[in-house]
Curated annotation (Swiss-Prot):
Keyword Nucleotide-binding found: yes
A Pfam family the protein falls into: EphA2_TM
Cell compartment(s), UniProt: Cell membrane
Region annotated Disordered, chain positions: 323-343, 467-486
Keywords recorded for this protein, A-Z: ATP-binding, Cell membrane, Glycoprotein, Kinase, Membrane, Nucleotide-binding, Receptor, Repeat, Signal, Transferase, Transmembrane, Transmembrane helix, Tyrosine-protein kinase
Organism: Mus musculus
Domain Fibronectin type-III, residue spans: 340-452, 456-554
Residue intervals of the Protein kinase domain: 644-899
Protein name: Ephrin type-A receptor 10
One CC-aspect GO term: plasma membrane
Superkingdom assignment: Eukaryota
Length: 1007
């Protein structure tokens, strides 16, 4: 580069010495962001070759840095000449990926006041520019001046040096950083304009910032250039390191800030199964360790009796003779099958013939707690070898079951007399193989049964079957050790099928044949036979399997052999027909009574017949049954457990879980059902109560009582299957649809419920728990009564509960609460409360009054006022149901009749506005002497669990319960209570106080 004829003496004097001092400093550049260098003039040891205009302006000189490395710099010092315009243009700088570029300048500048004769021409600043281009402009074609370059800034020195600094060798190096951008072209030139300063440009460094390539949370993030806008974050997706994986819903990502710092990490990666985190990598689990899932951070040592021989194991294999159950997690220890049961003992009873077994648990459970027992029965020949044994077949019954026993006792029934049995009891657990029951881990016992009737069912011949007699024959038993044929007697027991086995008849004979007479035509009989020697051995023998014989009907009505039973039947039917005809003639016409002795002109005349065919059923008390499991099948259909599909849980029931599901019976469409299950571990009393509920529900057949579809008693768990009411409990349904139903629709729900209660009372059944929550609703607003799980001998429940609880006192009659007496009349009282709940859209009876307060108020004569839009005659019916004397309450037949007529009225009369629920009239003029439940506003707030608002009430002037009772919703809003839930609780409590005023001042309904 041309430098002219020679350097100006002042320029050398003021610039070279400070330059040497500046080079000794060595700049420091702190910061954690990564800087991508685009230009660093100090890194070039050759000439920079920048373009200078004019040639007498900027000049390139050489120097050394603090490490004695040569560097190239530019300087200018034409301070004694006016109107300086000296330009210096760098070479073309590619911007790379940077949009926001930083320019760092290091320079020294002479204080103009220290230069003699430079006043007016010397400057202490210079200008920096940049020019965006797509390509290099070239050294020979400078494009300086004009309006094309963009000015970066006017650069001034923080410190300038003087003549004295030169003598003291003081260092006055300035560093300035400027930002340019955003850039859009491929590169740019920098230009520096001198207007008369004495300046040395020591270093020019151009760079952009980027976020460093890093690994965080086991995710690798590449180097990322910062955005040009300072507030913009660049989202960068990370890549999981080797042997790691991310969450699909939250992949790893970070955000690169404008200053080159990583911000806002989201998500992370986890080491895959078989690997664990170590720093920023995932290393394999060593032998003896495993990791089953990425969700676990570290490898775990192998559980007991298992091992892992390789690196990166995801599970540990079990040692020989050990195994895991399919339901065991990989973290479970390996276990083995149990040893055989110990001390197997038996006892044999003769009548009935039964083999009872009991045993002790195995000495070695295999390390598991899920030990069960399985029985195998073999029938062996009397004198043959053990290998001649055959499976007992389906004839033999096992109680409680043959396999899956947790009990250590079992009974075998329906064994054959005169036979030899071998019974094996195997111990099993979760790792026992499918053939373990027949394996070596069993205990066995061999038993010979005594003599008896060794007949199969098909060995008893039906020789002759007539309308009134049956002839049977069989082969004579000749087993070894059995009574001889000359001394054998036979006992034949028979009874009508469907009758109790306790009401049977017997016939004895010495021959292997018998004819039983005096039977009923067209009747199915059950016959059983046993053989024994005469004497006390009869009771030790068992009867043969039962056979059934159907006697034919009479061939001709006029037969001389016609039985007396047929004659009685014909006479009875004839008498009933005659009696029916007479009663039809004596039928009377009468108008229904309205309770006042006067008829209604619009009432239609109805015909009442005093003669009824006796078809009414009587309720069978489940607790009067000896075995509810047998009794339930008299009224309920036994369902195959495979036909019931459970879909989702509806909540917890009294004895287990309540689910909804589907019932698929052969030849029928799939039916939605509700399924009540009996949970495992229930006591015997709970199991009996569960069966009693099914037995109770199975006796009812009414369109407004929940229908029993069937029961599952031969599977686990026990199930009660009922029809599914898809809209749930009535009280919840009404609360969710408040304001959507008119009074006529609400009243339309009541006649059906009254009809159901009439049906129950006529059967002699007392519900004991009638409430709106025990009424279920299905599509079409069809309501059905449920809740039949309360046993007939249940005592009255406790009546003292919290203010928010469901106290039985809200629905129970006074005699129930005082004496525990239940009757149809007490159900009438509860039905009155249900009518009130319906018309009040499921509101809690007596609002927030406690059970104790309700009992006292009812005893004092307080009765619920009519809900809004409640017809007055319906409220009068409620009051009739709430008569203190049970004998004065209406019967359900009367209630049903009254409600049915109300539903036919075009527009029932509403209650007066002054008597409607929650009267809005002010309470300021009413005496307010006492609140039995609360002594102060603080106590009232404590009962509501809202003590935190005591200061709010005091500050607003509500210091007494009288004042609180007069508050409105607007008053409450002025207290500054922001929680909607708390405001609703306070409004509910204020309403309860207002109700107390009604009670104390006689404003409620008194009876």
């Amino acid at each position: 580069m041309e430098t002219g004829a020679g350097p100006h003496p002042l320029r050398l004097f003021v610039c070279l010495i400070p330059l040497c001092l500046a080079l000794l400093l060595g700049p420091g550049r702190p910061g954690t962001a990564e800087e991508v260098i685009l230009l660093d003039s100090k890194a070039s040891q050759a000439e920079l070759g920048w373009t200078a205009l004019p040639s007498t302006g900027w000049e390139e000189i050489s120097g050394v840095d603090e490490h004695d490395r040569p560097i190239r710099t530019y300087q200018v010092c034409n301070v004694l000449e006016p109107n300086q315009d000296n330009w210096l243009q760098t070479g073309w700088i590619s911007r790379g990926r940077g949009q926001r570029i930083f320019v760092e300048l290091q320079f020294t500048l002479r204080d103009c006041s220290s230069i003699p004769g430079a006043t007016g021409t010397c400057k202490e600043t210079f200008n920096a520019y940049y020019l965006e281009t797509e390509t290099d402009l070239g050294r020979g074609r400078p494009r300086l001046g004009g309006n094309r370059p963009r000015k970066i800034d006017t650069i001034a020195a923080d410190e300038s040096f003087t003549q004295g600094d030169l003598g003291e060798r003081k260092m006055k190096l300035n560093t300035e950083v400027r930002e340019i951008g955003p850039l859009s072209r491929q590169g740019f030139h920098l230009a520096f304009q001198d207007v008369g300063a004495c300046v040395a440009l020591v270093s020019v460094r151009v760079y952009y910032k980027q976020c460093r390539a890093t690994v965080r949370g086991l995710a690798a993030f590449p180097a990322t250039a910062a955005e040009s806008a300072f507030s913009t974050l660049v989202e960068v997706a990370g890549t999981c390191v080797a042997h790691s994986e991310g969450e699909p819903s939250s992949p790893p990502r970070m955000h690169c800030g404008a200053d080159g710092e990583w911000l806002v990490p989201v998500g992370r990666c986890s080491c895959s199964a078989g690997f664990q985190e170590h720093g920023d990598i995932c290393e394999a689990c060593p032998p003896g360790f495993y990791k089953v899932s990425p969700r676990r951070p570290l490898c775990s040592p192998c559980p007991e009796h298992s091992l892992a021989l390789e690196n990166a194991s995801t599970f540990c294999v079990c040692q020989d003779t050990y195994a895991r159950s399919p339901t065991d997690p990989p973290s479970a220890s390996c276990t083995r099958p149990p040893s055989a049961p110990r001390d197997l003992q038996y006892s044999l009873s003769r009548s009935p013939l039964a083999l009872r077994l009991r045993w002790l648990p195995p000495a070695d459970s295999g390390g598991r707690s899920d030990v069960t027992y399985s029985l195998l029965c073999l029938r062996c020949g009397r004198d043959g070898p053990a290998g001649a044994c055959q499976p007992c077949g389906p004839r033999v019954a096992f109680v409680p079951r043959q396999a899956g026993l947790r009990e250590r006792a079992a009974t075998l029934l329906h064994l054959r007399p005169g036979a030899r049995y071998t019974v094996r009891v195997a111990a099993l657990n979760g790792v026992s193989g499918p053939a373990a029951a027949a394996g070596a881990t069993y205990a066995q016992v061999t038993v010979s049964t005594g003599p008896g009737a060794p007949w199969e069912e098909d060995e008893i011949r039906r020789d002759r079957v007539e309308p009134q007699s049956v002839s049977l024959s069989w082969r004579e038993p000749v087993p070894a050790g059995a009574p001889g044929t000359n001394s054998t007697e036979y006992e034949i027991r028979y009874y009508e099928k469907g009758q109790s086995e306790q009401t049977y008849s017997t016939v004895k004979t010495g021959a292997p044949a018998v004819t039983v007479t005096n039977l009923k035509p067209a009747t199915r009989y059950v016959f059983q036979i046993r053989a024994a020697s005469p004497g006390p051995l009869w009771e030790a023998q068992s009867f043969s399997p039962s056979i059934e014989v159907q006697t034919p009907g009479e061939v001709a009505p006029g037969s001389r052999d016609q039985s007396p039973a047929v004659v009685v039947t014909v006479v009875t039917i004839s008498a009933l027909l005659v009696l029916g005809s007479v009663m039809s003639v004596l039928a009377i016409w009468r108008r229904p009574c309205d309770g006042k002795g006067s008829g209604n002109a619009h009432d239609e005349e109805e015909l009442y017949f005093h003669f009824k065919v006796p078809t009414r059923r009587t309720f069978l008390d489940p607790q009067s049954c000896g075995d509810p499991l047998q009794a339930v099948h008299l009224f309920a259909k036994e369902l195959d457990a495979k036909s019931v599909t459970l879909e989702k849980s509806l909540g917890a029931g009294r004895f287990g879980t309540l689910c909804c599901g589907c019932l698929q019976l052969p030849g029928r469409q799939e039916l939605p059902v509700a399924v009540h299950t009996l949970r495992d571990g229930c006591s015997d009393s709970q199991r009996l109560s569960f069966l009693a509920e099914a037995l109770t529900l199975g006796q009812f057949d009414h369109s407004h009582i929940v229908r029993l579809e069937g029961v599952v008693t031969r599977g686990n768990p026990l199930m009660i299957v009922t029809e599914y009411m898809n809209l749930g409990a009535l009280d919840d349904f009404l609360r969710h649809h408040e304001g959507e139903l008119v009074a006529a629709q609400l009243m339309g729900l009541l006649p059906g419920l009254a009809s159901a209660m009439k049906y129950l009372s006529e059967m002699g059944y007392v519900h004991r728990g009638l409430a709106a929550r025990r009424v279920l609703v299905s599509s079409g607003l069809l309501c059905k009564i449920s809740g039949f799980g309360r046993g007939p001998r249940d005592r009255a429940e406790a009546v003292y509960t919290t203010m928010s609880g469901r106290s039985p006192a809200l629905w129970a009659a006074p005699e129930t609460l005082q004496f525990g007496h239940f009757s149809s009349a007490s159900d009438v009282w509860s039905f009155g409360i249900v009518m009130w709940e319906v018309m009040a859209f499921g509101e809690r009876p007596y609002w927030d009054m406690s059970g104790q307060d309700v009992i006292k108020a009812v005893e004092d004569g307080f009765r619920l006022p009519p809900p809004r839009n409640c017809p007055s005659q319906l409220h009068r019916l409620m009051l009739e149901c709430w008569q203190k004397d049970p004998s004065e309450r209406p019967r359900f037949s009367q209630i049903h009749s009254i409600l049915s007529k109300m539903g036919q009225e075009p527009e029932p009369s509403k209650c007066a506005s002054t008597t409607c629920l929650r009267p809005p009239t002010p309470l300021a003029d009413r005496a307010f002497s006492t609140f039995p439940s609360f002594g102060s506003v603080g106590a009232w707030l404590e009962a509501l669990d809202l003590c935190r608002y005591k200061d709010n009430f005091s500050a607003a002037g509500y210091g007494s319960l009288e004042a609180v009772a007069e508050m409105t919703a607007q008053d409450l809003g002025s207290l500054g209570i922001s929680s909607t839930e708390h405001r609703e609780s306070l409004l509910s409590g204020i309403s309860a106080l207002q109700t107390r005023v009604l009670q104390l001042q006689g404003q409620g309904v008194q009876v």
